[in-house]
Amino acid sequence: MRSIMENLIKNNPTIAIVAGEVSGDILGGGLIKALKVKYPQARFVGIAGKNMLAESCESLVDIEEIAVMGLVEILKHLPRLLKIRSDIVQKLSALKPDIFIGIDSPEFNLYVEDRLKAQGIKTIHYVSPSVWAWRQNRIYKIAKATNLVLAFLPFEKAFYDRFNVPCRFIGHTMADAIPLNPNRTEACKMLNIDENQRYVAILAGSRGSEVEFLAEPFLQTAQLLKRKYPDLKFLVPLVNEKRRRQFEQVKAKVAPELDLILLDGHGRQAMIAAQATLLASGTAALECMLCKSPMVVGYRMKAATYWLAKRLVKTAYISLPNLLADEMLVPEMIQDECTPEKLVEKLSVYLDETESAVQNRQVLIQRFTELHQLIQCDADSQAAQAVADLLEGKVNG
């Protein structure tokens, strides 16, 4: 009887997947596609966006219902979110899937994982929360709720290993999407800009609070750079219309005369086209490394937030390239260090045309390439294999 059940699971599993936002849905779509190669008859059910729906995942709830961002929005919708979370647990408990995969959204998914695991359902958390950086005691909650964590980055797995929590490093989907040698000519063509021109890309962040604190020093940096290097032009990708309006308002006050090329999105192409990039910390810094653009990371926040972060954050670096390299590969100019003068000083290392500057740039790009290779592992397939191994009892969580 047991072998009949095992064969049934192996050939025809029910796989529950919950994505809490657009980025999770993209990962979910790639994962389902890879899982279908292994399990053509599998049933996929959970909370899905357009990418997962395109791969025939049944969605029990519209993803828009839970895709809320920011503390104020979350508090505003908290009763509804808690009800949806309880309903999902109830529905999946009745369905009894062979495995549950929660993609990111830890506040939502770890609760679901904990409840389902207690019923004997195997659970995976895909995308590690930043437990290695702050609130490290969350590791115990993760250990209780999951059979396996899928991590994008090798230092994340090393952290879980320290606590004997099952974790598999699968590489990063972004490293799979960006070629090792990005095509600058193609990027310039896509942006409709002259490839013979020198550019600096400026990315002041995707959140309103980031643009609020960074737009002014970044614009002042561009003013100083223009005086020092008159041939430079500036590419400014903005994630949406709201951020564009916010940035334009700051520019009108701080640097009305400054000539900028404002872009709707196209951050990746801007970084590939640029001689150097000035950006906020976050996933953009990893993307910039993969685009092989020498960068300076700048970050400012409220004084109270910075005071708290200094006490909570346990890592030596804040940017992903430096965390990956485990060294100060790119400058991090935080809070009082994030001044136009200091940002210009650091960017000049990449923009000067001396022999040593050219050599430094080449060495940095080589290191970026090595780190790219480290995390370019075909993450979708690696994630699917990890799911299959747990599903078929080849690993124990």
Swiss-Prot record:
Reaction catalysis annotation: a lipid X + a UDP-2-N,3-O-bis[(3R)-3-hydroxyacyl]-alpha-D-glucosamine = a lipid A disaccharide + UDP + H(+)
Keywords: Glycosyltransferase, Lipid A biosynthesis, Lipid biosynthesis, Lipid metabolism, Transferase
EC number in record: 2.4.1.182
InterPro entries reported for this sequence: Glyco_trans_19
Record-level GO cellular component terms: membrane
GO biological process, one term: lipid A biosynthetic process
Listed pathway(s): Bacterial outer membrane biogenesis; LPS lipid A biosynthesis
UniProt-recorded Gene Ontology molecular function terms: lipid-A-disaccharide synthase activity; phospholipid binding
Pfam families in UniProt: LpxB
Family: Belongs to the LpxB family.
Biological role: Condensation of UDP-2,3-diacylglucosamine and 2,3-diacylglucosamine-1-phosphate to form lipid A disaccharide, a precursor of lipid A, a phosphorylated glycolipid that anchors the lipopolysaccharide to the outer membrane of the cell.
Protein name: Lipid-A-disaccharide synthase
Native source species: Mannheimia succiniciproducens (strain KCTC 0769BP / MBEL55E)
Record lineage: Bacteria, Pseudomonadati, Pseudomonadota, Gammaproteobacteria, Pasteurellales
